[in-house]
Amino acid sequence: LTIMDSIRVSIIQTDIVWENKQENLRLLHEKLQSLRGTTEIVVLPEMFSTGFSMQSQTLAEPNSGKTISTLKQWASLFQLAICGSYIATDNGQFYNRAFFLTPEGEYYFYDKRHLFRMGREAEHFSAGNKRIIIPYHGWNICLLVCYDLRFPVWSRNVKNEYDLLIYVANWPIPRRLAWDALLRARALENQCYVCGVNRTGMDGYHLKYNGGSKIYSAFGEEITS
């Protein structure tokens, strides 16, 4: 691990209004207003605007759709980077697409590689096939999604490519022990900072969530404040 300038990361751990993009965007706008000037990166849960829904055909948007267009405006307005994931459509396929939007208008995205078959995600979405490393404020950031956490080879930090590993998730209560243990394990084995962001509340499939969002140092120490 090299010595770098510090970076301020804020986690938004929240309930998600089921399949209601407009309301979830409204609630996010309120939270971003309160974070103006206090942080450099805001991290949202997986599928922050809909919840972990399999209604890909009715909820999907292109990169040029309202959700990403709105977030681009807010990243510029509030002068912070925003990352999370949403239901995307691209070339006739549907993806659980993670995004990273900078105040300068840069847009990076990563399509979830490991789809959660037990939740039938693979029946409604296509898997991505490449990682992305995002340069931001002197840091290199790797952005992954939920079930990717269970596949350590996919996140392997070969040649110290990245400094911060971000997982955005909808990780339910029955599997919380795995979430807690694997986030710390990824920090230790990759010698990097790890940020995991989960939701709260209950989704439309009656799965319950209790957060547990955390940031770990490369030494496995929890540094969330």
Residue positions per predicted region:
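Cys-nucleophile CN-hydrolase/nitrilase-fold catalytic domain and related Cys-dependent amidase chemistry
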Residues: 21-22, 29-103, 108-109, 172-186, ...
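Short polar catalytic/cofactor-binding loops
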Residues: 13-18
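Short, acidic/polar
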Residues: 23-32, 149-156
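Structural motif
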Residues: 40-41, 141, 164
